[in-house]
Structures are given as C-alpha cells and as structure tokens.
C-alpha cells in the first residue's frame, strides 16, 4: 500500500514538473533512459518530502516491499535515522531483512539435513556465491551459501549503522553474536527472537 502511495506521488511530481513518467514498447533507449532518470529524480524528491514529513512507517514499508534497490530508499532512510539518533526506527527498518535472510537460510539448512542427514559446512564455505547466483543450477548448499552471504552483508551493514548511532552495548553484542552464528552456520530459530522489533 505504501509503495502504491509513494509511486503515485512520484508520478504526480513528474507530471507537475513536466518530466516523462510513462513509457511504451516503442520508446528509444534514450527515451527510456530519460524516463528512468526522471523517475529516480522524482523518487529522491518524494523520499526527501516524506522524511521531512516524518512518514517513517510508510517509508519503512516501501523499503521492506523490495520494489526499490537499497540505495533508493533503504540506505538514505537508514542514514537519516542514524544522523537523527532514531534507534527504534533504525531497528524496525533493518531487523526484518536480516531475520528473513536468516530464516530462509535456516529453512534450506533443514531441507538439506532432511535430505542428506547432515550439513557439509566446508563445501558451503567454499561456494563462490556470485558464480552460483549467475549460474542456472540449483542446490541446497548453494542456496544456503547465498542466504548466508545476504544475511552477513545485512548484519555487517546494520552493525556499522549501530556503531554510528552509539546503540546500547548489549544490543550491539546481540548483533555480533548473531553475526557469528550465521557465519559459522550454528544459528537456531531462537537466536532471531531479539530481532522482531516493531514500531
């Protein structure tokens, strides 16, 4: 819902400013690029407006929806929360993605253990994730490595934000423990309980 509102406001802003907002299959590459550039400009403007209006829940919903690359909404919003010491908003923004990636990894680990009786951790560590993702083959071990990398990237980014915002030491320690358990694949579902914060 928030994504729809956001998109409508971007479209309105583009129209009000005489910028292209609709394309066709017959558009030239130049026309398509101009439209996409205009959309990005409009997105940044509406993001700025919504931040000024403190429409944080809606922006977090947009970020969680996955319709935009992280550098469009997620990262600028996280940086705003850090700069303004909005710890609860930062938690709500960041924890969900980490939890989902870790849950996906746990689910795939369970499937692998059910199918093969054990987990080959060394093989998982040696998987080149970008090559696996670019390929067309599927394997539980490759998926575990993919989710592990995604979760670790998210945790490391979050830990950086937490250090900047001077988060409570005990919470930062929980994040570090989670990072270790994801890294060595010893994570359990109960380890994610502290990461279910809601506004």
Regions from the language model: what does each represent?
Residues 2-67:
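N-terminal alpha-helical interaction modules that lie
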Residues 29-40, 66-75, 101, 128-136:
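Generic helix N-cap/helix-start motif at coil->alpha-helix transitions
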Residues 47, 78, 135, 142, ...:
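Conserved small-residue packing positions in alpha-helical repeats and bundles
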Residues 66, 97, 104, 151, ...:
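Alpha-helical solenoid scaffolds that mediate protein-protein interactions
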Residues 197-199:
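Non-Sec secretion/translocation targeting segments of pathogen effectors
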């Amino acid at each position: 819902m928030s994504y729809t509102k956001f998109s409508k406001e971007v479209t309105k802003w583009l129209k009000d400013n005489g910028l292209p907002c609709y394309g066709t299959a017959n558009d030239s590459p130049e026309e398509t690029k101009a439209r996409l550039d205009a959309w990005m400009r409009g997105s940044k403007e509406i993001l700025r407006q919504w931040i000024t209006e403190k429409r944080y829940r809606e922006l977090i919903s947009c970020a969680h929806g996955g319709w935009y690359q992280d550098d469009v909404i997620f990262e600028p919003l996280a940086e705003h929360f850090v700069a303004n010491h909005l710890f609860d908003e930062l938690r709500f923004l960041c924890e969900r993605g980490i939890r989902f990636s870790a849950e996906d990894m746990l689910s795939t680990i369970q499937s692998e253990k059910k199918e093969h009786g054990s987990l080959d951790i060394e093989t998982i560590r040696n998987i080149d994730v970008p090559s696996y993702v670019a390929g067309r083959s599927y394997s539980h071990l490759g998926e575990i490595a993919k989710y592990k990398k995604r979760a670790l990237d998210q945790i490391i980014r979050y830990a950086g934000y937490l250090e900047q915002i001077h988060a409570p030491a005990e919470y930062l320690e929980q994040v570090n423990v989670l990072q270790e358990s994801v890294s060595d694949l010893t994570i359990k579902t109960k380890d994610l309980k502290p990461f279910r914060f809601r506004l």
